[in-house]
Amino acid sequence: MLRLSAALLLAIAAPAAAMAEPSPYPALAALEARVATIGYRLTTGNAPWCARVQPQFGWLWGDPRLYSDAQRPAAEAAYGAADTDTPFLAAVAAGSPAAVAGLHAGSLVQGLAGSLPPQGEGSDPYARIAALERLFAGLPSDRPTMLDTGKAPVRIAPVVGCATDFRVDARDRPDGAADGRLVVISAGLAQFAKDDAELAAAIAHELAHNILGHRARLDAAGVDRGLLQQFGRNARLFKQTEIEADRLSPWLMANAGYDPRAAVRFWTAFGQRAGRPLLQAGTHPRWQDRAASIEKEVRAIEAQRAAGQPLAPPLIGAPPPLE
C-alpha cells in the first residue's frame, strides 16, 4: 500500500449541511491518539534497525486550515484546540517526550522558539503540517528543543526513532500509504483492527515500506505508477515490496512490544472483508498467502526468542534486489 492519496480530506471536507449529523471528530481524534502511541512505539523501538532516523516527539499534528469555517468549531472542540489560526497537536503518545513535557491534544505549537513559524507552500491544506514535520525531523535527536507555544517556551527532549511521521486519513475507504518519510492510515483500514496490536500490524506494514526504502527502490527500478502498474514487471515489483513489508512487519511489532501474531489476525480479517474486490490486484499477494508469509516470520521470531537470541529479521541490512 505505497500510494499516497491525493485527497486525504474527502471524509472530513463534507458540506456544511452534513454537520447536522453527529460530529465525526471525536472518533477521529481517538483514532489519532491510538496511531500516535503505536507509531511512537514502533519507530523508537526499532530505531537500531533503521538506516534513516529522526527525532521522535510522540505527536500527530492538527491544523485549523484543514477545516471549513462551518467545520472548525466542532473540530477544535474535539481536539481541545483554541480558535486561532495556529497548528496544534492532534494527539500525543502516552509516555512520549511530548507527554513528559506536559503537552497534550489541543496544545498549540507554532514551531521553534525564537524562529518564524513555517507556513508551507501552495494551497494544500496540509502544507503547514508538512512544513512542521520536515522542520522537526531535521533537528538533532540528542539535544532538547525549545517549542514556541505562543506562551512560555516549552523544553522537550526527543528520542531517536525511524525516520517517519504519521497521519490519519478520515475516509472510510480501507487504505494505507507510505512515501518514504510519511505513513498514512485511513479510518476505513483501522476499523478491521479489533485492538491496538492489530492496528499496529497495519501501521507496521506501512512503516516497513519506509524502512526498506521501497519508494526509492521502485523509482530506481523505473516502475510505472499509472494504469500500467497492474501489469507485467511493474505489478511483479510492487508485489515484491508488499511481500517484503508483510515479512518485516511482525518483527517490528515484536520489537515494539506487540504480539506479532496479531498481524495474521488483522490481514485475515481484512482479506475476508465484505465487499472486497472479486479480482485480486496484481500488485498484492492473496490474503491467504500474506497470512502464511507472516505466520512463517512469527515462527522465526518465536524460535529466536526461545533460543535466547536477539531478534534479527532477515530483511534488515540485506533486502533482496528488485528484479
Predicted segments, located by residue:
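Bacterial N-terminal signal peptides
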Residues: 5-15
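A Zn2+-metalloprotease active-site environment signal
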Residues: 19-323
